[in-house]
Swiss-Prot record:
Pfam families: MscL. This is Large-conductance mechanosensitive channel. Channel that opens in response to stretch forces in the membrane lipid bilayer. May participate in the regulation of osmotic pressure changes within the cell. Belongs to the MscL family. Its main location: membrane. HAMAP family: MscL (MF_00115). The gene is mscL. The keyword GTP-binding does not apply. It is a multi-pass membrane protein. It is found in: Cell membrane. Homopentamer. The lineage of its organism: Bacteria, Bacillati, Bacillota, Bacilli, Bacillales.
Length: 131
C-alpha cells in the first residue's frame, strides 16, 4: 500500500496539482490585499469616503457585514477573471502547438524518385557553378 501511495504521490499530475494549490493560495492572498488595501479604498473615496469594510446592518444583536461581502465579491471577480485570462492563454498556446504539429505532419514527403531527382538537380547546379 505504501508503494502504491509513493507511485501516486510522485506522479507528475499530483505534484502539478500541489504546486497549483500552493500558488493559488498565495495568489488569493495577493488579490485579497489588492482588493482590501487598494481597490476598495479608492472606490470608497470615489463614492464619497465610504469605508466598505465597516459597512453593516445591525438587526438586534446580529450584525450583517455587507461591506465585507462586497469586498469578497470583488476579490472573487478579480481571481475569476485572472483565471479566465490564464486559461485563455494556455488554450491559445495549445492551439498554436497543435497547428504546428499538424503542419509538420502534412508536409509533403518525397518519393524515392523525387528525392533522386532533387539530388540530381542539386548536383547539376553545383557542376554549373564550378565551371
Amino acid at each position: 500500500m505504501w508503494n502504491e501511495f509513493k507511485k501516486f504521490a510522485i506522479r507528475g499530475n499530483v505534484i502539478d496539482l500541489a504546486v497549483g494549490v500552493i500558488i493559488g493560495g498565495a495568489f488569493g492572498k495577493i488579490v485579497s490585499s489588492l482588493v482590501n488595501d487598494i481597490i476598495m479604498p479608492l472606490v470608497g473615496l470615489l463614492l464619497g469616503g465610504i469605508d466598505f469594510s465597516n459597512l453593516s446592518w445591525k438587526v438586534g444583536k446580529a450584525v450583517v457585514k455587507y461591506g465585507a461581502f462586497i469586498q469578497t465579491v470583488v476579490d472573487f471577480l478579480i481571481i475569476a477573471f485572472s483565471i479566465f485570462l490564464f486559461v485563455k492563454l494556455i488554450n491559445k498556446l495549445y492551439e498554436r502547438v497543435k497547428k504546428q504539429e499538424e503542419m509538420e505532419e502534412t508536409e509533403p514527403t518525397l518519393t524515392k524518385e523525387e528525392e533522386l531527382l532533387t539530388e540530381i538537380r542539386d548536383l547539376l547546379k553545383q557542376q554549373r557553378e564550378t565551371m
